[in-house]
Amino acid sequence: MSMEEKQNFQTSLDFNQNIFKPSTREEIVEIVKNCYKKSIPLEISGLQSKNKIGRNFQAEKTLDLSNYKGIIDYKPEELYIKVKAGTPISEIEEALKKNNQQLAFEPNDFGYLFSGESNSGSIGGVVACNFAGSRRFKVGSVRDHLLGFQGVNGKG
């Protein structure tokens, strides 16, 4: 990142807002570090596909990862795909389908229960919750098929 990009980046984050919608890893790191330093509770959110499951979460700020999406690398011959956390499962399945492939696990789609429409969520939410469908006993869970991931903690 150039010096000019760093200056623009630092001034573009308004920490007075309640919902952050970063689109880069650097923005995510900056937001998490800042909230950690100030002891601000932070809810991590994506496509809201699982927000009606479990207890309500009370946080001062929300880190919405729905803008941090996209397929970074896909090698069909290697059965390998690298994506950002906010990438919708539907986008991943669409890319795989073009090569006559599918996910090795079965992501749940709770959208039909809550809104009557499909919403299988983002890959980040699926990995975080480790939800898988009825084929889980035979083919394994989400994390069984995960080769790696990059995370962010309060120190960056």
Describe each PLM feature range.
Residues L13-F110:
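Glycine-rich N-terminal segment of FAD-binding domains in flavoprotein oxidoreductases
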Residues E5-Q10:
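Intrinsic disorder at enzyme termini
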